[in-house]
Amino acid sequence: MTSFKTIASLLLIILLVHILALINYWYWTYQWLDIPMHFLGGFWAAMAIIFLISNFQFPIQKEFLNQNFLRFTIVILSFVIFIGVFLEFVEFLYDIFISSRGYSGFLQLGAADTIADLFFDLLGAFVFIFIYRIQERFKKV
């Protein structure tokens, strides 16, 4: 499930939908579109981080993946939230330098939107973690 091909394919799908959404103003027409995009982003980030750990022992040792569920979940969610917060800053800077000059609509709709974005990032990551752990359990059987 965490092959490079799967990770790259999901990233390309997310980027394609995101680019189409920006070009066609879907984020402003269909405000709900932001929810599945953040969910998929969190799902992808968790997938990518677990792939990096299991294949390159980056940024932590591979043995970590087999430790207790709570510790594993907290560390993976921490990496995902770091990426999510970084992307919220990117949205903020986009609004300052691009949207404020009239080139596009605003991406930051306020604190509630930011919190919802981060929540769905984490939810997507948690769903992937759950699927990953179930898959790993069945491999051991």
PLM features: residue spans?
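Bulky hydrophobic segments
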Residues: 1-112, 122-141
